[in-house]
C-alpha cells in the first residue's frame, strides 16, 4: 500500500499531544489515521496505542503498552488505502467468508491467537483488535478526495470459525448489549451517508441459505464503518437505551444514537457478530432499511423494498416486513375488499349524484322561469320609466333631470352628432329631428307633472340595506367612463388623471367615431316610424306638426327605433270601434249628429272610391260628415291607438251614419229599432275587424 495510514487513531492517557490532537489531559485523540482536521498531518503519534497498516498486511504485534504497534505481519490481506481500486461493499458476511477462505488457503497465518490478544487488549484499554480489511470494491477511476477517512470498512478477524466465535475462545462476546451496539452502530453508519456500491458480484462467494445473491448480505457491514467513526463503539458501546456492557469500559467516544431513530438498535436477539443471521425475525426487522442509500440518504432508507423481498421470504415474512412502512399482503387483501366496498359506494354515490343533478336541473328550470318572469316585469317597469325619462334618441342620452337634458341639447357633442347626420341626410330632415327631440321632451315633462300630481314619489329602495360594517362597504360617487368601460371614483385628482391619460384619449376618439356612425342608424330608424313620417311630411310642407300632435310616436311604438308600432290585439280594436259606433248611434238618435269615426282628416283616400260614392249619394250625409270633422278630431285626441283601425272600419260606420240620417226624418223611432241598429252595427264592426 503506497499511502498507508500510520495509525487509525491514537488514545493517550497522558498530556502528550501532537499538533492537531483532540483534547488534552486524560485522553487525547489524534484524528483518524493521524489526519488532523485543523492542521497538518502528523504521522509520528506519541500515544499509548497505534494502529498501523503495512503495504499489504495488518501488523498486529503487541507493544509494551498493550497497544497494537507495527510488527511482523500477522496475516496477508489486500491493501487498504486511498488507492483508485476502492469499493466498500456493505456485506459483512461475504467479507467474513472471503477472509476465512483466504486464511484457510494461507494456513491461518496470524491466527486467532493474535486476535484473542487483540480482543483482550481491546477489552482492557478500549482498543481495536487486529482485523483484516478485505477490499472487494471494483476499480474506480480514482479515490474521492472528499470522502472522509472514516468511511472505509475495517473488519475484525473472526478466525476460522464460521459462526463468528473468534476461534471458540470468546464465545462470551455474544452479548446482547454488544449485538445491539453493533446494530446501533449499523444504523448510525447508514445514516451518515457512508454508503458504497454493492454491485460487485464477486463479493458473494459462499452459498449461505440465509443470504440471497444481492439482498440480505448488505445491512450488517456498516457497523464496522461505525467502528471507524466512534473508535470501537459499534461493538458493544453504550447507548442511551441500555446500561454499558460488562466486558468493556465506558466508551470515551460520544454516543450519537441512531440519527434520531430511537430504539432501532434494541433488537432482543443473541445473534453472533454478523455470522449466519439465523434469526428470521432479525432478518425481517432490518430488511426494510436495506437499499436506496446512494439516492435517499438518512431519511430515505428502504423506500423501495419489494424488489429484494421476492428472493427468499415467505408470504408471512413479507407481510411482517412490509408492516413497518407499507401495507402487508393481508392489508392489501383487506384493501382489495375495502376497495370493492368503496366501488359499490362510489356507484351509489354516482346514482345519488345523478338524481341530485336531475333535481338540480328541475330547480334550474324553475329558476330560469322565475328569472324570465322577473325580466318581463323589469322590462315593463323600465318601459314605464322610459315614458317619464328625458331622452335624446340620436345621442342615446337619457336622464331624469330636466336640466341635464337641456344641457345636452345645447352641448357640443349633440351638435357635432347632428352635424355628422346632416352629411348623410338632408338639412331639413336634421332640423326636424332636432325639433322633434325638443318637443318630445316637453311632452315627457308634462307627463311627469301629471304623474307627480296623481302619485306621490315613492322612496327608492336602499341597495345597501342589510350590508353591515363587517363587509367594509362604503358608498361613494363614481364616474363611469363609457369609452374605457371603467368606474372612476368622483375625486378631482382621479378624474383629471384619467381624463389626461393616453388610453382615455385614444379610446374616446375611437368611441366618438363609432358613436357617430351609430347615431346615423338611429336617426334613420326614428325617421322610419310611420307617424314620424307623416309629421316630417307636414314639416317639409311648412306646417307645424307638433302643435296638433299630442301622441309620442316613439312611446306609442314602445320606444322602439325600428320603425314598428306597437300592435293592439283584435279584441282591443273591436272594443274601440264598438264604442265609437255606439256613440254615433246614440247621437244620431238624439239628433246631435253622428261623429265621423275616421282617425284622420283623409278617410276617403284610405277607404277607396266606394266609400266616397256611398257618402256622396246623400247631400245630407255629406253635410253631416262635414259637421262631424271637429268631433272626429277631438275623438282622435282621446283615442289615439284606434286611429287606423277605425279608419278601416269606416265603411260600416258610414252606412250606419246614413241610416241615422234617414232616421232623423222619421217620427219618434221606437227603442227597439234603435237596439236593432246597435246590434247591426256591432255585427258590422266584428266583420270589419278581420279585414284589418
From Swiss-Prot:
The modification Phosphoserine is found at residues 112, 199, 323, 328, 339, 662, 685. Highly expressed in heart, liver, skeletal muscle, kidney and pancreas. Expressed in mature dendritic cells. Disulfide bonds: none annotated. Residues 1-210 are annotated as: Interaction with DPY30. Residues 576-593 are annotated as: Required for interaction with MYCBP. Changing residue 664 to H: In a breast cancer sample; somatic mutation. Signal peptide: none annotated. Residues 168-203, 231-254, 269-382, 545-571, 592-692 are annotated as: Disordered. Residues 387-450 are annotated as: Involved in chromatin-binding. Residues 109-201 are annotated as: Interaction with DDX5. The modification Omega-N-methylarginine is found at residues 109, 233, 277. It holds the Pfam family AKAP95. Its main location: nucleus. It is found in: Nucleus; Nucleus matrix; Nucleus, Nucleolus; Cytoplasm. Residues 1-195 are annotated as: Interaction with MCM2. Keywords: Cytoplasm, DNA-binding, Immunity, Innate immunity, Isopeptide bond, Metal-binding, Methylation, Nucleus, Phosphoprotein, Protein transport, Repeat, Transcription, Transcription regulation, Transport, Ubl conjugation, Zinc, Zinc-finger. Residues 572-589 are annotated as: RII-binding. Anchoring protein that mediates the subcellular compartmentation of cAMP-dependent protein kinase (PKA type II). Acts as an anchor for a PKA-signaling complex onto mitotic chromosomes, which is required for maintenance of chromosomes in a condensed form throughout mitosis. Recruits condensin complex subunit NCAPD2 to chromosomes required for chromatin condensation; the function appears to be independent from PKA-anchoring. May help to deliver cyclin D/E to CDK4 to facilitate cell cycle progression. Required for cell cycle G2/M transition and histone deacetylation during mitosis. PANTHER family: A-KINASE ANCHOR PROTEIN 8 (PTHR12190:SF6), A-KINASE ANCHOR PROTEIN AKAP 8 (PTHR12190). This is A-kinase anchor protein 8. It comes from Homo sapiens.
Amino acid at each position: 500500500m503506497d499511502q498507508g495510514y500510520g495509525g487509525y487513531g491514537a488514545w493517550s492517557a497522558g498530556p502528550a499531544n501532537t499538533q492537531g490532537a483532540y483534547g488534552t489531559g486524560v485522553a487525547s485523540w489524534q484524528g483518524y489515521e493521524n489526519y488532523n482536521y485543523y492542521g497538518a498531518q502528523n504521522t509520528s503519534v506519541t500515544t499509548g496505542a497505534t494502529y498501523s497498516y503495512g503495504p499489504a498486511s495488518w501488523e498486529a504485534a503487541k507493544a509494551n503498552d498493550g497497544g497494537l504497534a507495527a510488527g511482523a505481519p500477522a496475516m496477508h490481506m489486500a491493501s487498504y488505502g486511498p488507492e483508485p481500486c476502492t469499493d466498500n461493499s456493505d456485506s459483512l458476511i461475504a467479507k467474513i467468508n472471503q477472509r476465512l477462505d483466504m486464511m484457510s488457503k494461507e494456513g491461518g497465518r496470524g491466527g486467532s491467537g493474535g486476535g484473542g490478544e487483540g480482543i483482550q487488549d481491546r477489552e482492557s484499554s478500549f482498543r481495536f483488535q487486529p482485523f483484516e480489511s478485505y477490499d472487494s470494491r471494483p476499480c474506480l477511476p480514482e479515490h474521492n478526495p472528499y470522502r472522509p477517512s472514516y468511511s472505509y470498512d475495517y473488519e475484525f478477524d473472526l478466525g476460522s470459525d464460521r459462526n463468528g466465535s473468534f476461534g471458540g475462545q470468546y464465545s462470551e462476546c455474544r452479548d446482547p448489549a454488544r449485538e445491539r451496539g453493533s446494530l446501533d452502530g449499523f444504523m448510525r453508519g447508514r445514516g451518515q451517508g457512508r454508503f458504497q456500491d454493492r454491485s460487485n458480484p464477486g463479493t458473494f462467494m459462499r452459498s449461505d441459505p440465509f443470504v440471497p445473491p444481492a439482498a440480505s448480505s448488505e445491512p450488517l457491514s456498516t457497523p464496522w464503518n461505525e467502528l471507524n467513526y466512534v473508535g470501537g463503539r459499534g461493538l458493544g458501546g453504550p447507548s442511551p437505551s441500555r446500561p454499558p456492557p460488562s466486558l468493556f469500559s465506558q466508551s470515551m467516544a460520544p454516543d450519537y444514537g441512531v440519527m434520531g431513530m430511537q430504539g432501532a438498535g434494541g433488537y432482543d436477539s443473541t445473534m453472533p457478530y454478523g455470522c449466519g443471521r439465523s434469526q428470521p425475525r432479525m432478518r425481517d426487522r432490518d430488511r426494510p432499511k436495506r437499499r436506496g442509500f446512494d439516492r435517499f440518504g438518512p431519511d430515505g432508507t428502504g423506500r423501495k423494498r419489494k424488489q429484494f423481498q421476492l428472493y427468499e421470504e415467505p408470504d408471512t415474512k413479507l407481510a411482517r416486513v412490509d408492516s413497518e412502512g407499507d401495507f402487508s399482503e393481508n392489508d392489501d387483501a383487506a384493501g382489495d375488499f375495502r376497495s370493492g366496498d368503496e366501488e359499490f359506494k362510489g356507484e351509489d354515490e354516482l346514482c345519488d349524484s345523478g338524481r341530485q343533478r336531475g333535481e338540480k336541473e328541475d330547480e334550474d328550470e324553475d329558476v330560469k322561469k322565475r328569472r324570465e318572469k322577473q325580466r318581463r316585469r323589469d322590462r315593463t317597469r323600465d318601459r314605464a320609466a322610459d315614458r317619464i325619462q328625458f331622452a335624446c334618441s340620436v345621442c342615446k342620452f337619457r336622464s331624469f333631470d330636466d336640466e341635464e337634458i337641456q344641457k345636452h341639447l345645447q352641448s357640443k357633442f349633440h351638435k357635432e352628432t347632428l352635424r355628422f347626420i346632416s352629411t348623410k341626410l338632408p338639412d331639413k330632415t336634421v332640423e326636424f329631428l332636432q325639433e322633434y327631440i325638443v318637443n318630445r321632451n316637453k311632452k315627457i315633462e308634462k307627463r311627469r307633472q301629471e304623474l307627480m300630481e296623481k302619485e306621490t314619489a315613492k322612496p327608492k329602495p336602499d341597495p345597501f340595506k342589510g350590508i353591515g360594517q363587517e363587509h367594509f362597504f362604503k358608498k361613494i360617487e363614481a364616474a363611469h367612463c363609457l369609452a374605457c368601460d371603467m368606474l372612476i371614483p368622483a375625486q378631482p385628482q382621479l378624474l383629471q388623471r384619467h381624463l389626461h391619460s393616453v388610453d382615455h384619449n385614444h379610446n374616446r376618439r375611437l368611441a366618438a367615431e363609432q358613436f357617430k356612425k351609430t347615431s346615423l342608424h338611429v336617426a334613420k330608424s326614428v325617421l322610419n316610424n310611420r307617424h314620424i313620417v307623416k309629421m316630417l311630411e307636414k314639416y317639409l310642407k311648412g306646417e307645424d306638426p307638433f302643435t296638433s300632435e299630442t301622441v309620442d310616436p316613439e312611446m306609442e311604438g314602445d320606444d322602439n327605433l325600428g320603425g314598428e308600432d306597437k300592435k293592439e290585439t283584435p279584441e282591443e280594436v273591436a272594443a274601440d270601434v264598438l264604442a265609437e259606433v255606439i256613440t254615433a248611434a246614440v247621437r244620431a238618435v238624439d239628433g246631435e249628429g253622428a261623429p265621423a269615426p275616421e282617425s284622420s282628416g283623409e278617410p276617403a283616400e284610405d277607404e277607396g272610391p266606394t266609400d266616397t260614392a256611398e257618402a256622396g249619394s246623400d247631400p245630407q250625409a255629406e253635410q253631416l260628415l262635414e259637421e262631424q270633422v271637429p268631433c272626429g278630431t277631438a275623438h282622435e285626441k282621446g283615442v289615439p291607438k284606434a286611429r287606423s283601425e277605425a279608419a278601416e272600419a269606416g265603411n260600416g260606420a258610414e252606412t250606419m251614419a246614413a241610416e241615422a240620417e234617414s232616421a232623423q226624418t222619421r217620427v219618434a223611432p221606437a227603442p227597439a229599432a234603435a237596439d236593432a241598429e246597435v246590434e247591426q252595427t256591432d255585427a258590422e264592426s266584428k266583420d270589419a275587424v278581420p279585414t284589418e
